[in-house]
């Protein structure tokens, strides 16, 4: 056999070896990790920024289970020790409750990676983002919006302006469904220090002060049950100011129904990741949580949807929306210039004390 033929056959053999190896690599069954999350643009953003990259980096087949929040499925899984889900995306109030009930694994905060800029995790995450059983993913806020061009050059800028009917007349739209958000906003706009708000609301005097502040709007108050309705009120003139969810401001802008925004005293909450207690894939689940709450992953989500990264270091990595080309930074609660006076809603406090306060709120509401 000639040397040339030997080389050719050797080369063919090498190619076949590579092809066979590739076949077995592609056909092998990857381990599955199932993450329960939400449908719609948020779940789509997580798929693009977290689930696919984690699967590629760690050789996992990430399955997505859609749910509507709450704890019923988690309670059944942990109670029966039959686990359909390995990681869950929670609204923070549910994560707090699940942690208190012993339904979630403890998460070692010291194991979380530093931010992309080197900031240690314990200094990088926003307040309330890291707890005994959860790690924050995104921040969303109730903010103040007002009808554009209504006040000319005298642009409202602060939460106090929401209550200033003399300078900025017109109807005010507030959330009807709960005292939460309304009482905090009233006290902050009345000049109370943020650190004093929840101590004050433990007392009749503090609640009275909040309700008196809200009562200064009597005769100008209208109510909403859905934040999208508040945007509609601003657009059609039923309201001059409204408290709204920041995501609805983004949606309105995409449909050319934009409103003007005041970020002062935004009231923020979080979505977080947690791991069901006793699940068989705890190690992989924890690995996913660390990956998904890294700076790059959180920035990727914020490039798709208007929810602020729960880590400050992620902001510099946020890009324009890949499909729409929209600059996302103006819509993010945690963006520079937006977060300086942000107030963290204390969901654990509301779980403990809300049942005592809500009846008082309903009585006051009926009097308006």
Go through the PLM ranges and name each one.
Residues 143-150, 187-188, 270-284, 300-304:
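A bilobed periplasmic-binding-protein/Venus flytrap-type ligand-binding module shared by bacterial periplasmic
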Residues 23-98:
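Early extracytoplasmic/lumenal segment of secretory-pathway proteins
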Residues 336-368:
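Conserved C-terminal helix/tail region of periplasmic/extracytoplasmic solute-binding proteins
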């Amino acid at each position: 056999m000639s040397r040339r033929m030997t080389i050719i056959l050797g080369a063919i053999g090498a190619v076949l070896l590579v092809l066979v190896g590739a076949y077995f690599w592609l056909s092998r069954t990857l381990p599955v990790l199932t993450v329960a999350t939400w449908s719609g643009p948020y779940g789509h953003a997580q798929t693009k920024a977290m689930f696919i990259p984690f699967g590629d980096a760690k050789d996992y087949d990430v399955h997505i289970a859609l749910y509507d929040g709450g704890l019923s499925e988690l309670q059944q899984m942990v109670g029966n020790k039959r686990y359909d889900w390995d990681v869950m995306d929670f609204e923070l109030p549910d994560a707090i409750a699940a942690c208190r009930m012993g339904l979630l694994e403890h998460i070692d905060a010291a194991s979380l990676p530093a931010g992309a800029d080197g900031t240690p995790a314990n200094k990088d995450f926003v307040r309330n983002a890291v707890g005994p059983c959860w790690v924050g993913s995104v921040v969303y806020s109730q903010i103040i919006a007002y009808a554009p061009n209504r006040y000319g050059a005298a642009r409202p800028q602060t939460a106090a302006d929401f209550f200033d009917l003399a300078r900025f007349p017109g109807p005010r739209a507030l959330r009807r469904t709960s005292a939460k958000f309304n009482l905090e906003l009233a006290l902050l706009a009345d000049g109370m220090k943020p650190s004093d708000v929840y101590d004050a609301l433990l007392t009749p005097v503090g609640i009275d002060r909040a309700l008196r502040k809200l009562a200064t709007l009597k005769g100008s108050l209208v109510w909403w049950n859905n934040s999208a309705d508040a945007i509609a009120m601003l657009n059609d003139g039923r309201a001059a100011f409204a408290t709204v969810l920041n995501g609805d401001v983004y949606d309105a802008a995409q449909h050319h129904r934009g409103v003007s925004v005041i970020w002062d005293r935004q009231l923020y909450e979080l979505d977080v990741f947690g791991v069901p207690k006793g699940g068989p894939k705890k190690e992989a689940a924890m690995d996913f949580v660390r990956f998904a709450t890294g700076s790059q992953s959180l920035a990727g989500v914020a490039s798709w949807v208007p929810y602020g990264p729960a880590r400050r270091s992620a902001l510099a990595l946020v890009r324009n929306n890949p499909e729409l080309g929209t600059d996302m930074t103006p819509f993010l609660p945690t963006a520079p210039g937006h977060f300086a006076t942000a107030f963290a809603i204390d969901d654990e406090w509301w779980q403990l004390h809300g049942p005592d306060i809500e009846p008082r709120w309903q009585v006051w509401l009926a009097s308006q």
